[in-house]
Structures are given as C-alpha cells and as structure tokens.
From Swiss-Prot:
Reported function: Inner capsid protein that self-assembles to form an icosahedral capsid with a T=2 symmetry, which consists of 120 copies of VP2, with channels at each of its five-fold vertices. This capsid constitutes the innermost concentric layer of the viral mature particle. It encapsidates the polymerase VP1, the capping enzyme VP3 and the genomic dsRNA, thereby defining the core.
Residue span of region 5-fold hub: 1-79
Region ranges (Disordered): 1-52
UniProt remark on domains: The N-terminus binds RNA. It is necessary for encapsidation of VP1 and VP3. The N-termini of 10 VP2 molecules form a cylindrical hub underneath each 5-fold axis of the inner capsid.
The protein, known as: Inner capsid protein VP2
Subunit (UniProt): Homodecamer; each decamer is made up of two conformers of VP2, called VP2A and VP2B. Interacts with a VP1-VP3 complex. Interacts with the intermediate capsid protein VP6. Interacts with NSP5. Interacts (via N-terminus) with NSP2.
Basic and acidic residues bias: start-end ranges: 9-30, 39-52
Keywords: Capsid protein, Inner capsid protein, Repeat, RNA-binding, T=2 icosahedral capsid protein, Ubl conjugation, Virion
Superkingdom in the source lineage: Viruses
Length: 879
C-alpha cells in the first residue's frame, strides 16, 4: 500500500511537470510574438527593467541542498540574462530632454538697461513745508520750507549710518541712467503764461506748491509764471528749468555730461552682425532702411573673462553652462524627413538576414531606434559643444551596434566633451568587444587611474595601419582654440568639418570586419561583421551627418559672445549610445540650418546676458570699493557678492558654497572701478554732511551728562533735547572711540559731573510722550557705551514735546520743564531758497535710442538643399 502511494505521487508529479512544461512553452511562444510585435510596431513606449522576483517552486525547496543550489544559480543567471535582453530589446523610447523653461525665460528676459525709460530726474532731496513753534511750544500758522530727504528710511535694529550711505550709493547705481532725454520727461507748467514746460513732473509739483503758498513773494510767483523751455533748433539743443537741490543738480548734470549713447548708422548695424554670419553665403541679409541723423544706440559691454568663472568656481560654472545648454537646445534646428523607423528596422532585419526576431545578439542592434531619439541626440551633441557641457555615455556592452555607433561618435566629437570615466568605459568596451577580438589579442586589463586611455594603449599594440591610424586620430581629436571677433571659439578639426574622417573610420571598420576573430565563435564574428555592414551601408549619410553637425555647430557658435572656456562640469548631460545608433541609421538627406530669426534671437540673448554680466560686475566692484572706504568691508562683503549673483538672474544663491563666495569677493576686489561709478561715489562722499542734516533719523552726535539737563525750546520742534552746537562741551570722536576701545575717559568725566559730547553720525529715535520721558530718564542710552562698550548700537532718544504731541497740555498746564540725561546734537537742515534751487538743464532736443539693432536687418536663407559648408560644397551631398 505504501509502494502504491509512492508511485501515485510520482505520477502526479510527472503530470504536474508536463503541465508546467506546456505552460512554459506557451509563455515562450507568446513572448516571442510580443517581442516581434513590439520591435516592429510603430508605437513607441517606455519599458523599464523587469523587477519580478523569480519564485522558487515548492518542489525545488523540497529537493536536496545541492540540487536547490544549482537550481538557484540557473534561475539567477536566467533572470539576469532576461533583464539585460529586455533592457535592450524592449526599450523603444529614449528618455527625452525636458527643457527647464524657467531658466530659459530668465535668460530671455534680460533686456538692455535702456529699456527702462527715464521719466524723472534723479533726486535725493525734496523741499518740505515744516511748521514753526512759538516759545511756549504752540504751533504757529506760518510754515517754512526746508530740503529734506525723499526716502528717509533707516531699518530697525542695530544699523550703522555708514550702511545707509552704502545703500544710498547702491540705489544711485541702480537708478543711474545710461542716457537722459529731457524732452521725453518734460511736463507742462500749470502756472506758465504761455504753456511753457519744466523738466519733469516733480519740478512742476514743487512750483505748484510754492505758487500756492501764501508766504511766497510776488517776484517768485512772477518768475514761476515765466518758467519755460528754451529751444536752439539749429544746434539740436533744448534748455529746461528745474528745481533741484545743489547736490541733485550735480548728479543730473553729471549724468547729462556722461551719457553712453552713440550715433547709430548702417555701418554700425552691419558690423554688429557676427562676421561669420555676414560672410555665410547661405544667409541673405538686407538693410533697406536709412537711419535718421538722430538715431542713437548704447554699445553693449562685452569685456571678456574678468572673473574667470571657469577657474575654481565649479558650482557657478555648472549653472552658467547649464543655462547656456538649455538656451542652445532651444535654437538647434530639428531634423527633418528622417528615414521611417519601421522601414529602416525592416531593412536592417533583411541586412542581418533575420528570419524571425529571436533572442540573439543581432536583435539588439535594432533596439531604441526611433526618430525622437535621433533628433534628441542631434540637439544634445550640438548644444553640449556650444555650452561646453560635459557629456556621459550610457550603453550596454552586449549591443555591438551601439558600440560601433559609439566609434562614429568618438570620431567626430572631441574627447574633452566626455567625462573621463565614461570615455574610458566606452573605449574599453570597444577595444575588448570589437578591436582586440578581431586580431585574436587577449582582453585589455585596464588599471583605473591610468593616465593613458584604452585607445592610447591600443594604438601602440595594434599592427594594422588603418585601425592604428583611426585610433591615432581619435586620441588626438581635440578642439582648436581660435579667437574670432575677440571671442575664444572651440573649433572642430577640418577633417571632421568636411566629413573626410568618416572615410578613415570606414577603412578601419572594413579592416576589422575582414579579420578572423580567431579566439571567438563564428556567431560572434558574424554579429560584429553584420553590425559593421549596417553602418558601412550608410557611409554617404554619415559623411553628410558629420558635415551637418559641424555646420550647425559653427553657425550657432558665431552668435556666442563670451569666451568658450572648456572645463569639465560638475554635472553631465547623459547620452545613450542607442540614440546615437538612431541618429546614424535614420538620418535622411534633408538639410537643416538655423533660421536667421533664430540666429538673431540667440545672438541677442547672448549679448544681453554678457552685457548685464559686465554691468553687474562694475556695480559690485564699485560697492566693494565704497564699503572699504566706509569701513564696512567685513560687515557687508558676503551680502554684496550675494546681491551681485542675484542680479545675474540665473543663480540659486543659497546653494553656492561659501568658499566660492569669498573667492568671488577676492576676484572682484582686484578689478578697477569704472570711472562713472567712482565719480558718483565721490559726489556722495563729499556731501555726506548735507545728507545727514536733511534726515529726520540721523544725528551728528550725542551729549551725555551725569545730571539731568532741561529740554529747551526749538523753533522747528518745540520743547526738545537737541543741541544745535557743541560750545562748552568736551568732544570725543565716535570713530576714534571705536578704534581705541578706551572708555575710561568718558566714565571719569561723567563721574566728575562733566558732560561729554560724542561726535559722529548715528541714528536716533523720536519720542513725544512725556510719560515715557519720566519713566526712562534716558539712563539706558549711554549704559551700552559705558558697560557693553558697543558704540555701533548707540541710538539716543530725541524727545519732542509741542502742541502736536499727546501730552503737551500736561506740560503746559503744570508749567513743568522736562529733563533728560542726553541731548541729541543735530544741525539745522538746509533751508529752501527758490533762487538758489532753480537750475537750467541742457540736453539734445531729440534723438531716438534703438535697442534691437538687428530689427533693421531683413534676412532669409537659400533653399536648404543648396546650402553649402565652408568648403563651398553642399552640406548634404547624398541625394
């Protein structure tokens, strides 16, 4: 009975095995059908690697340990092989490039500064009516005009007045116009008898306010009624009356005398077009319009390599090259009339003599071939060279067709364009898969870190002349650095430009296909030979493709204005060799060249970015110099560099490492200050006292006493703890106190009941509450100096009590005179005098500034089929 049971179990197991075998056969048949359908179908789909875990059957678990180990190894090997095959065969679509539209928009939005039309003059000051207070603190009906600051804002917290001047200088640099055309900003003077005009709307509003002021003299009113422009048409000059503070007048007069506009004519526009575009016979350029004599333009600032961002600024350089890459991809033309993917795969199948697409080495040759991948590869190669972005290669060693396509890639693209590790891996795969087996040589065992590449080693060991000759060319394939129109260009080898190098490649491939592959099976030799045959059948198309690649690269390169420095980038652009196979196999005979509009757009974006880059460098250098002279060098330096990077628009400042920030600071420090920016700073420096006096938040010093001092009556404020002069006080300079750190002198004087005056610009706060005055007694104001010894945090309180204050009548009713232990030393602001503030400004009567010079050029191209390369032969000869 036991025997029968054992036999029954064996029969059941046999039946079970038969069923499993049938299922496996059906599964394999269906897999074959699915594979052939997927490879030959027009539909393109992304298929990722299979992640199914191989399930071990219960029978295998129950078997002996040795059998289970063997079975596990077999299944594991099968799984790995299946994954590798699926990766190649089922991968129908190459992941395409997704443009970062935000970066592209940032680049394209950088416009020349002249686009900001000046509608007003530059002003720091404006006249304000201030009340007058009687001796008892009551406000009078009369007012008085003073020059006050237009933007009198000091941030809260510890804030040095010197930082205010640095920010003011930054504001002046931001608003400093490249040109001023007074005619464009002039407005009507409402009080004029003959509809005259004044220079800008602010002058008109000041005149209006003064005219309506009851205390204005009749002579001044009559003068305002006579204010109008004076035109000298024969000299193309116009004079406009303006109301300006003397310092503001100095600024605007300087801007008028140092305008950046230059006369514009057809010759300038002609020379503005890149020379290689002008001389390219494929582009027909016309300029129909004659410019008026009043045409003007601002010459772009295209100085080269002032900061050398390619040298030791890895993060910054990576960002710049990435932006340039995205921009370049947007202008590289799309390929047209590519060979039908389905037709080409069928033809390749016939060439390979494949009766059915079974899982064997030749079937991998057809993987990943589609027009999208071909176009993507074409754009990637050209954009990477234009932006000098480093590329990395992605490939599978068992796909011989990918490696043979890679041989074309390494022939036409200089070695420097690939990251070293990727280049070595690809070359090693080509050597060990194709070259060495052909001659029966042992596999190359390459040591990581070897200064020589696998191709260098192979060149020395290969005896065949044609193969060694091709290896020699690839090993020495580097960009030639040529300066054209003052710009460093990375130029391709002439043999690549004219396509002759492809013949050299084909000679080497033919030699390899004729070899016996003595150490390899016949199938291996046949696979390599058929792969070479597929590529050699497209010799003419490959020559054309190489010429097309070189022509588009060099034509777009003519529009680059910054030196093309070649340094390996931190990140790389991935290029799959299957997409290179797509490009080689699907390239048709349709020529594509950039349209003139695309070229002009690319050129304008490059010019605008480069010019803005240099202008922002000038600003940063000027502010660093100003910070140094204002003793703010340590305090503000990193913020200045961060602002500089923000104004270039393309950088994510928070992600830039500190070491690169400080290296950038050191480079900026070495550059000279531009003369206009230096003159403007000197103007501010010479008039710091006037600016301080006009502010309601900056004092010229503080008086500290041990005993309380009475608040005194002031015509501008009422009862106030202000000192208008320092007569009779011992004076100590705040700057010297900070430098020396010797506070004993102040302490001794205060203990001896002698008031001391600390002289220097410092911010103060205003309080008009009597209650707070009683509560504070101002002891905290100088405690910081005596105890904490921080002069830069000193911020005295100015107590202002008058009929506008909340607690004024409390003081008036009790006839109480408040006291304070500190007095703010504040000089009287400059009084407004109409006669001294009236200035005549002179500018051209009219001129027109043109920002887009290429708008005057009408451009067209020859028929693409007739387009010729540098050797005066058609780019695409294979028709």
């Amino acid at each position: 009975m036991a025997y029968r049971k054992r036999g029954a179990r064996r029969e059941a197991n046999l039946n079970n095995d038969d069923r499993m075998q049938e299922k496996n056969d059906e599964k394999q048949d269906s897999n074959k059908i699915q594979l052939s359908d997927k490879v030959l179908s027009k539909k393109e789909e992304v298929v990722t690697d299979s992640h199914e875990e191989v399930k071990i059957t219960d029978e295998a678990k129950k078997s002996t340990k040795e059998e289970s180990k063997q079975l596990l190894e077999v299944l594991k090997t099968k799984e790995e092989h299946q994954k590798e095959i699926q990766y190649e065969i089922l991968q129908k679509t190459i992941p395409t490039f997704e443009p970062k539209e935000t970066i592209l928009r940032k680049l394209e939005d950088i416009k020349p500064e002249l686009a900001k039309k000046q509608t007003k003059l530059f002003r720091i000051f404006e006249p304000k009516q201030l009340p007058i207070y009687r001796a008892n603190g009551e406000r009078e009906l009369r007012n008085r005009w003073y020059w006050k600051l237009k933007k009198d804002t000091l941030p809260d917290g510890d804030y040095d007045v010197r930082e205010y001047f640095l920010n003011l200088y930054d504001q002046v640099l931001t608003e400093m116009p490249d040109y001023l055309l007074l005619k464009d900003m002039a407005v009507e003077n409402k009080n004029s008898r003959d509809a005259g005009k004044v220079v800008d709307s602010e002058t008109a509003s000041i005149c209006d306010a003064i005219f309506q002021d009851e205390e204005t003299e009749g002579a001044v009113r009559r003068f305002i009624a006579e204010m109008r422009q004076r035109v000298q048409a024969d000299r193309n000059v116009v004079n406009y009356p303006s109301i300006l503070h003397p310092i503001d007048y100095a600024f605007n007069e300087y801007f008028l005398q140092h305008q950046l506009v230059e006369p514009l004519n057809n010759d300038i526009i002609f020379n503005y077009i890149p020379e290689r575009i002008r001389n390219d016979v494929n582009y027909i350029l016309n300029m129909d319009r004659n410019l008026p004599s009043t045409a003007r333009y601002i010459r772009p600032n295209l100085l080269q390599d002032r900061l050398n961002l390619h040298d030791n600024f890895e993060s910054l350089w990576d960002t710049i090259t990435t932006s340039n890459y995205i921009l370049a991809r947007s202008v590289v033309p799309d390929l047209k009339e590519l060979v039908s993917t389905e037709a080409q795969i069928q033809k390749m199948s016939q060439d390979l003599q494949l009766e059915a697409l079974t899982i064997q080495s030749e079937t991998q040759f057809l993987t990943g071939i589609n027009s999208q991948a071909a176009n993507d590869c074409f754009k990637t190669l050209i954009a990477a060279m234009l932006s000098q972005r480093t590329m990395s290669l992605d490939f599978v060693t068992t796909n011989y067709m990918s490696l043979i396509s890679g041989m074309w890639l390494l022939t036409v693209i200089p070695n420097d364009m690939f990251i070293r590790e990727s280049l070595v891996a690809c070359q090693l795969a080509i050597v060990n898969t194709i070259i060495y087996p052909a001659f029966g040589m042992q596999r190359m065992h390459y040591r990581n870190g070897d200064p020589q590449t696998p191709f260098h080693i192979a060149e020395q060991q290969i005896q065949n002349f044609q193969v060694a000759n091709w290896l020699h060319f690839v090993n020495n394939n580097q960009f030639r650095q040529v300066v054209i129109d003052g710009v460093l260009n990375q130029v391709l080898n002439d043999n690549i430009r004219n396509g002759h190098v492809i013949n050299q490649l084909m000679e080497a491939l033919m030699q390899l296909s004729r070899q016996q592959f003595p150490t390899m099976p016949v199938d291996y030799k046949r696979s390599i030979q058929r792969g070479i045959l597929l590529l050699s059948n497209r010799l003419g198309q490959l020559v054309d493709l190489t010429r097309l690649l070189a022509y588009n690269y060099e034509t777009l390169m003519a529009c680059i204005t910054m030196n093309m420095q070649h340094v390996q980038t931190l990140t790389t652009e991935k290029l799959q060799l299957t997409s290179v196979t797509s490009l080689c196999m699907l390239i048709g005979n349709a020529t594509v060249i950039p349209s003139p509009q695309t070229l002009f757009h690319y050129y304008n974006v490059n010019v605008n970015f480069h010019s803005n880059y240099n202008e922002r460098i000038n600003d940063a250098v000027a502010i660093i110099t100003a910070a140094n002279r204002l003793n703010l060098y340590q305090k503000k330096m990193k913020a200045i560099v961060e602002d500089f990077l923000k104004r270039l628009y393309i950088f994510d400042v928070s992600r830039v490492p500190d070491d690169q920030m400080y290296r950038l600071r050191d480079r900026l420090r070495l550059l000279p200050v531009e003369i206009r920016r230096l003159d403007i700073f000197n103007l501010i420096l010479m008039n710091m006292d006037q600016i301080e006096r006009a502010s309601d938040k900056i004092a010229q010093g503080v008086i500290i006493a041990y005993r309380d001092m009475h608040l005194e009556r002031d015509e501008m404020y009422g009862y106030v703890n202000i000192a208008r002069n320092l007569d009779g006080f011992q004076q100590i300079n705040l700057e010297e106190l900070m430098r020396s750190g010797d506070y004993a002198q102040i302490t001794n004087m205060l203990l001896n009941n002698q008031p001391v005056a600390l002289v220097g610009a410092l911010p103060f706060i205003t309080d008009s509450s009597v209650i707070s005055l009683i509560a504070k007694l101002d002891a905290t104001v100088f405690a910081q100096i005596v105890k904490l010894r921080k002069v830069d945090t000193l911020k005295p309180i100015l107590y202002k009590i008058n009929s506008d204050s909340n607690d004024f009548y409390l003081v008036a009713n009790y006839d109480w005179v408040p006291t304070s232990t500190t007095k703010v030393y504040k000089q009287v602001p400059q009084q407004f005098d109409f006669r001294n503030s009236m200035h005549m400004l002179t500018s051209n009567l009219t001129f027109t500034v043109y920002s887009d010079l290429l708008a005057f050029v009408s451009a067209d191209t020859v028929e693409p089929i007739n387009a010729v390369a540098f050797d005066n032969m058609r780019i695409m000869n294979e028709l």
